[in-house]
UniProtKB/Swiss-Prot annotation:
Family that this chain belongs to: Belongs to the universal ribosomal protein uL3 family.
GO annotations of cellular component type: cytosolic large ribosomal subunit
Highest taxon, organism lineage: Bacteria
Region described as Disordered: spans on this chain: 144-166
Keywords: Ribonucleoprotein, Ribosomal protein, RNA-binding, rRNA-binding
Protein name: Large ribosomal subunit protein uL3
GO molecular function: rRNA binding; structural constituent of ribosome
Claim: RNA-binding is one of the keywords in the record: yes
NCBIfam families (UniProt xref): L3_bact (TIGR03625)
Gene Ontology process terms (BP): translation
Biological role: One of the primary rRNA binding proteins, it binds directly near the 3'-end of the 23S rRNA, where it nucleates assembly of the 50S subunit.
Length: 227
């Protein structure tokens, strides 16, 4: 695997192809700049990886209700602050780790920017999906509804949930109504349409998980059979 970049989803718009004039729906992501905060090696951690940080943590404090009240950072713990001091940068709110084969190309404090990618490249985008609250069987699992005729008593019910006396219970994992969305989701093999290095913007074809303002992780596509 290779290192990726963190960013913020700004919203959607459209761009036009120069040759055909065809409109392409794109999502605009403000990606980076990120800072390398830790380098893991086989000798120290048992595997090779690069940790990057994104988004400067605001200098806001909160008071701990301890025997001796004290002020601490609202967004970072003491352990996180101490960890970030080693990289020599400003306190960063979000940290992510990417497995890499070789860490020789990275150093603490190094900046990761959108020039890591190129137009036309395929990427995997990870983010938290939009929460939709409590949802029924049709909306959550795409169940087929029952007949809508006057005599039907099963319009949007699930049907059977399992056997009867034996086992006398509903098996774990049964698809039922419940909370929908607000989970970590990865959309794979999306195409980068344009890159704006001056404004740290990536224009990615199609939609990506989350609403505007969502933290997004973008990494080169993990295609089966290719390194």
């Amino acid at each position: 695997m290779v290192v990726g970049i963190l960013g913020t989803k700004l919203g959607m718009t459209q761009v036009f192809e120069a040759e055909t004039g065809k409109a392409i729906p794109v999502t605009v992501v403000e990606a980076g700049p990120c800072v390398v905060t830790q380098i893991k090696t086989e000798q120290t951690d048992g595997y090779t990886a690069v940790q990057i940080g994104y988004g400067e943590a605001k200098n806001k404090t909160r008071q701990l209700n301890t025997k001796e009240p004290k002020e601490v950072n609202r967004y970072l713990t003491n352990a996180q602050e101490g960890h970030l001091v080693k990289s020599g940068g400003t306190p960063l709110r979000y940290l992510r780790e990417y497995r890499v084969d070789n860490t020789g190309n990275f150093e603490l404090g190094q900046q990761i920017k959108v020039d890591l990618f190129e137009a036309g490249q395929l990427v995997d985008v990870t983010g938290k999906s939009i929460g939709k609250g409590f949802a029924g069987y049709q909306k959550r699992h795409n169940f087929r509804r029952g007949p809508m005729a006057h005599g039907s008593k099963n319009h949007r019910l699930p049907g059977s949930t399992g056997p009867g006396t034996t086992p006398g219970r509903v098996y774990p994992g049964k698809k039922m109504a419940g909370h929908l969305g607000n989970v970590r989701v990865t959309t794979r093999k999306l195409k980068i349409v344009r890159i704006d290095p001056e404004r740290n913007l990536l224009l990615i074809k199609g939609s990506i998980p989350g609403k505007s303002g969502t933290l997004i992780s973008i990494a080169p596509a993990n295609i089966v059979g290719q390194k």
